[in-house]
Swiss-Prot record:
Lineage, highest ranks first: Bacteria, Pseudomonadati, Pseudomonadota, Gammaproteobacteria, Oceanospirillales
Keyword Cell wall biogenesis/degradation in record: yes
Family assignment from sequence similarity: Belongs to the MurCDEF family.
Top-level taxon: Bacteria
SUPFAM superfamilies for the chain: MurCD N-terminal domain, MurD-like peptide ligases, catalytic domain, MurD-like peptide ligases, peptide-binding domain
Gene of this entry: murD
Stored InterPro entries: Mur-like_cat_sf (IPR036565), Mur_ligase_C (IPR004101), Mur_ligase_C_dom_sf (IPR036615), Mur_ligase_cen (IPR013221), MurD (IPR005762)
Recorded GO CC terms: cytoplasm
Key word Cell cycle present: yes
Function, in words: Cell wall formation. Catalyzes the addition of glutamate to the nucleotide precursor UDP-N-acetylmuramoyl-L-alanine (UMA).
Record protein name field: UDP-N-acetylmuramoylalanine--D-glutamate ligase
Coiled coil stretches, renumbered: none
Catalytic reaction annotation: UDP-N-acetyl-alpha-D-muramoyl-L-alanine + D-glutamate + ATP = UDP-N-acetyl-alpha-D-muramoyl-L-alanyl-D-glutamate + ADP + phosphate + H(+)
Amino acid sequence: MSILARDRNIAVIGLGKTGLSCADYLTRRGYGFCVMDTRENPSGLAELNAINPDVPVVTGKLDQDMLARAAEIWLSPGVPLSHPDLQAVKGQVKICGDVDVFSREANAPILAITGSNGKSTVTTLVGEMAKACGVNVAVGGNLGTPVLDLLADEVELYVVELSSFQLETTDRLGALAATVLNLSEDHMDRYADMMAYHLAKLRVFYGCRRQVLNRDDALAQPPLSREAEITWFTLKTPEPGQYGVLEEKDGAWLAYGAEKLLPVEQMRIRGKHNWSNALAALALADAAGLEREPCLQALREFTGLTHRCEWVADKDGVAYINDSKATNVGATQAALAGLGPVTSGGIVLICGGQGKGQDFTPLAPAVKEWVSTLIIIGEDGPKLKEALAGGVMALSAETMEEAVKLAAEKSSPGDLVLLSPACASFDMFKNYEDRGDQFKQWVRAL
């Protein structure tokens, strides 16, 4: 921040959680700033007034003159860089995001996690591992607390989840270690193609000292770097120096090379995709120098996150799992591939919603292999049905109540009812949390 001239304002774009965090940060440090939001009446106006009642505010548009005169433009992740008013000043004024500012100000090492799926789980798990080792850790980013709110002198380690939107405006994160857990089609309503999404995700590695890479997902791997160390993780047998899975007579083990670390049956989070998440977390913890045994104990105790392959109930021999956070095809693929092999019966899958321009056909093989019945909801239900229903019974439901009741009717003891929509929720629900909460409500009412 010392590089900024105090006689020129920062232009903060967006009055959501990130913009309000930026406003609070600048106010506490005595910097002048203005705020703009393309919405006429953004919900954050009252909170901004409480933070700083004197700040200039423009709503309903971006003010071109104020943008051109700004020292920097701090852009919220919900506003695309392609906005015409931002393109008009690109090259004249530095455009960055809160993560870029955070990376300049953080005085402790950063572990950065991104990917299409699993990033909140891994971020939270690494945070729990650090706490188990007695480290003063700050955890946040895309999953909760904005990164600027994490900054504190006493913090010894930052563990942050980052979205592709946040990374678009991050020039050089400089993380101690970073990972792209996996990559599958998502946000195609924002990106021109999969390559643009891929390149945004790979920005997490800029200036990174150790890259934690998924050996099983070529899309999640950057070009090999001479500057960064590399640690690999895989669901296959690991090579020396890699994290992976050993299939032994007594079951599957998480392993580091030939060293067995933890039997997967001791983990409380379900599914093979969570084996991969656990391995990535262990690799990141290793990069931060955390002691292994407290990390393994934290892994044993970790129960997972709400709305992410969350166990809800067992009813009449049928397990009900809430994976409402699965808002893209890759997340639902991971849930099916992870839960299918450990389910004695079939899976009754509730899916659908707003597809965000995704191609649903990559989900078809997993549906064919593991799903006995499809219950389809939401505005892109017809597209899902067309892409997935070949050879599988497909039924439509107008509400979550109807979907849960249909799923209960079509399931038998040993089956698993899985809400894993592969879509956004806003056509029928307030958000994915509301969708998951309604699922749990109607399951418990059965």
